[in-house]
Amino acid sequence: MPVLRHMLILLCTCMLALPMHAQENVDFKGTSCVLVRTTTEEELAFRAGERMEFILHYKWGSINADVGTAKVALDSLTFNGHEAFRCTASGRTTKLFDLFFKVREEFASWFTREGMRPLKFTRDTHEGGYEARNTYLYRWDEPEPYIAADVYTSKLGQTSMQLPLTP
């Protein structure tokens, strides 16, 4: 059910949206694949402790039903010595729709409270017979920063790689 995955990704992205005036603070010099904004926690459009729950509804032809639920949460914590946020998003089909196509999705993203620099991202996906487990750990403190990526899919198996990351 790719609609559920896309909705969860959209929800996480929306939770991380910054106020428009924060774009003035973006430094594009030396930009790499990861855009890090220089903004303070007070300027953010969200706060730790926020929770959202959704009922996922599907309408197609004669099908008009609630097919699943999604949850998004934002917490504050310390991650490897950094004051950080953890945004979690999960989704699942209802027991009735599990009979047709069972979906279980879990996403988590850790990022610094000041500057919103990514620290870690995880994904645990089960959609019908397809599975994916991904972990991306941002190694900012290395002499040549990189993302340590561990990626598993039921179709391609396990892959580990280092993706270059320029701070």
Task: Tell where the protein language model's regions lie, with residue ranges.
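Short, ordered beta-strand-loop transition motifs
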Residues: 8, 77-83, 140-143
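A short, surface-exposed beta-strand/turn
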Residues: 103-117
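Short beta-strand micro-motifs enriched in acidic
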Residues: 75-77, 110-114, 139-141
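Coil-to-beta-strand transition motifs
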Residues: 82-84, 115-118, 131, 144
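N-terminal secretory signal peptides that target proteins for export/translocation
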Residues: 1-4
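Bacterial N-terminal signal peptides
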Residues: 6-17
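Solvent-exposed helix/loop surface patches that form functional interfaces
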Residues: 24-32, 39, 47-49, 131-167
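N-terminal cleavable signal peptides for secretion/export
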Residues: 22-106, 124-131
